[in-house]
Design a protein with these regions (language model features):
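Helix-loop junctions and terminal segments of transmembrane helices
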Residues: 52-71, 130, 247-281, 330-339
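Interfacial/gating helices of multi-pass transporter permease domains
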Residues: 21, 25-50, 163-164, 202-206, ...
Length: 493
């Protein structure tokens, strides 16, 4: 149980670390590239995203099998690298045609193509780490982000390499990420194990299921295309995206429950679910309160013009909170499913399983969001002539909130049938109470400038945990046990 919390705390810390390093990296990039060069990088990254999308299909099965004790470490890496070859070839064939669209030097395509192999390798290694050593996902993130910043400083400020320097930096950061995981997984990787062709055949024959599971993420983005098409303006997207970039930080709290899924695959029980929920809520609740009550000063950090998007953030924060809880319920639903343990699982068996039914609910959710976005955005454009961009963005948000409430209810009801757990309402009340005290203190500080806001957030975090530790004895014990475990834990194993 403590190991689950330890893994969650490590990965959560790496997520918070990545917020600051990501901000530094973007500042370094935008200050050292022209607007055209930055646009070229985004264009290259967009094309790359289509060929690295399949990188997660085989690892979907790897985590499930490896967590249950199957020796599939080598099969995982080899199979995913085999999958990468046709997509790497397709990218190189596509490059000459894609380069003519906005007149890009072909050498940039060849340079960024290295990422294809690195992403496929890192994804297979991450699947192995998630199955048995989830805390390694935090270590790899620290390695990736630190390498990215150090190399960016060298390649941009000293060597002045420009766009090639940006691509090389990301390539080398991915390489460091892979090397970090290989080092910590070295014992598992050098073990002699029989290459199980039966399992490999099963993965490839059932690859349609992880593909079916991943597609809702692509479909879910159509609501923003509808918004852009109806408004014929980038302003609505800008307001929506800047608010979502802040609210998305709440979802980082999900990393505290990262070890729940592999734990359930190994035969975890209701106590694992309840403890994971408590630990998630401990961080997600204050972050949600902070995003709501500090909406304007936080958005001011980006630009004063974005303060109007505080209306969106006020509703988007609780939406992301519910969405994150739904994600945990989803982990419970698919984590306890055992259908794939059978030797000869038929197509019909998978269709009857929760591995198919849960993603299917996500399709319904996205369908609701897309239809309602069209209806609400059309209404907003008809009746709100002033600030139509803001209200059109809000209509898209409202559609997604309704869709997420539907999925949250279905997810909760399905998950408690799968594992009869109790939702920790008493803990939720204590976290809300400590968060309310934090918000009152923050209102007295009343930050205006960007640095003041960052300082206020840090002060708010301290106030929250001091208040929480004073009213919740279990929280003090949890952190004490986690840090005791960290002292005893052998980092190099």
């Amino acid at each position: 149980m403590i190991r689950i919390k330890y893994s969650g705390l490590i990965v959560f810390s790496s997520k918070i670390f990545s917020i600051f390093t990501g901000l530094i990296f973007i500042v370094l990039v935008t200050r050292n590239l022209s607007i055209i060069e930055f646009g070229v990088w985004q264009y290259l990254s967009l094309i790359l995203s289509y060929v690295i999308f399949p990188a997660g299909l085989i690892p979907y099965w790897v985590t499930r099998f490896y967590a249950r004790g199957y020796p599939v470490a080598k099969a995982s890496i080899i199979s995913n690298m085999i999958v990468s070859l046709p997509f790497f070839t397709f990218f190189l064939i596509l490059a000459p045609f894609a380069s003519t669209i906005i007149n890009i030097n072909l050498s940039l395509f060849y340079l960024i193509s290295i990422q294809i192999f690195l992403v496929y390798l890192s994804t297979s290694l991450e699947a192995l780490a998630l199955a048995r050593k989830p805390h390694l996902l935090g270590f790899e993130a620290f390695a990736f982000e630190s390498t990215k910043i150090v190399l960016a400083l060298i390649l941009f400020t000293i060597l002045k390499l420009g766009l090639k320097g940006v691509i090389a930096t990301v390539n080398l950061a991915y390489l460091m990420q892979c090397l970090t995981l290989i080092f910590f997984l070295r014992k598992e990787l050098i073990k002699e194990e029989e290459f199980n062709y039966k399992i490999l055949k099963k993965w490839f024959s059932s690859i349609w299921l992880p593909l079916f599971n991943a597609l809702p993420a692509f479909i879910g983005g159509l609501d923003l295309f509808i918004l852009a098409a109806l408004t014929k303006s980038a302003s609505s997207l800008a307001f929506y995206k800047v608010a979502s970039s802040v609210a998305a930080v709440i979802s980082y709290s999900l990393s505290t429950s990262i070890a729940l899924y592999p734990s359930l695959l190994k035969g975890g029980e209701r106590r694992d679910v309840e403890e994971a929920l408590k630990f998630f809520l401990m961080f997600a609740v204050p972050m949600s309160f902070g995003a709501v009550f500090l909406a304007k000063p936080i958005l001011h950090i980006f630009k004063s013009d974005y303060e109007k998007a505080s209306l969106l953030l006020f509703f988007m924060a609780p939406q992301l909170f519910l969405k994150s809880l739904t994600h945990i319920f989803g982990d419970v639903i698919v984590g306890v499913e055992k259908i794939d343990e059978k030797e000869n699982t038929s197509f019909k068996d998978f269709l009857k399983s929760k591995l198919f039914k849960w993603p299917l609910l996500n399709y319904f959710r996205n369908g609701i969001a897309i239809i309602l976005t069209y209806i609400f955005a059309s209404f907003a454009l008809t009746y709100f002539s002033n600030d139509f961009s803001l209200y059109a963005a809000f209509s898209c948000l409202l559609a997604n909130i309704i869709a997420d409430i539907f999925l949250f209810i279905k997810g909760y009801l399905t998950s408690i049938k799968a594992v009869s757990f109790n939702f920790p309402l008493n803990k939720l009340f204590k976290y809300c109470l400590a968060s309310a005290v934090m918000v009152i203190a923050l209102k007295f500080l009343n930050p205006v400038k960007s640095l003041e806001t960052i300082f206020t957030i840090a002060i708010g975090s301290i106030i929250y945990f001091l208040c929480l530790f004073s009213i919740d004895f279990e929280s003090r014990i949890i952190f004490k046990k986690v840090f005791t475990y960290m002292k005893k834990f052998n980092l190099w194993e």
